[in-house]
Amino acid sequence: MAPAKGSSLTPIQVENLQFPASVTSPATAKSYFLGGAGERGLTIEGKFIKFTGIGVYLEDTAVDSLATKWKGKSSQELQDSLDFFRDIISSPSEKLIRGSKLRPLSGVEYSRKVMENCVAHMKSAGTYGEAEATAIEKFAEAFRKVDFPPGSSVFYRQSTDGKLGLSFSLDDTIPEEEAVVIENKALSEAVLETMIGEHAVSPDLKRCLAERLPIVMNQGLLLTGN
């Protein structure tokens, strides 16, 4: 892709959270562009309460792998296609997911729901076994002593070889070192599946991905406004 001819990807604001158009991780020295961002919340007593803003960052190599199948499709077509989001999840490029808190949450409180969703998906997909149960235990342990005040973040790095790197920050800064790396491909993919897959916790994030990625696939990638 020739950047000079590409489309301009801009940052995204989710409530008071800013998601830059691109980031570079000091832990890996890799750069990622913002595929999309959106809110996650729950309806409590008839009122929608926003708890988290989620941003999905992709390596630029993801664009070509997605474009071979999805270039030329409309945003609505992509939003309506589960296969599109599954292709993002399984694309042969590294992903970095940032989950930043809008309300205070304990690590145990936050991770419990994430783990429930991941285990439910893996069981339904037939990928949950002894290794995955052990990986879930490591996941729980990583969050046990963590608290999330408003504005704090968890970063999930999903490597192409199935590793899931976790890091924690009191703001939106990517830590220089990861807190833990869990070697389990099924769990790694399940984290993103629960966010943008069949039973997505953030329809807003899915909509944003379906709106932004067609522009990149059709016009190339040019990052602005970091």
Swiss-Prot record:
Substrate binds at residues 52, 117, 194. Keywords: Flavonoid biosynthesis, Isomerase. It is an enzyme of class 5 (isomerase). Signal peptide: none annotated. The record marks 110 as: Important for catalytic activity. Catalyzes the intramolecular cyclization of bicyclic chalcones into tricyclic (S)-flavanones. Responsible for the isomerization of 4,2',4',6'-tetrahydroxychalcone (also termed chalcone) into naringenin. This is Chalcone--flavanone isomerase 1. It comes from Lotus japonicus.
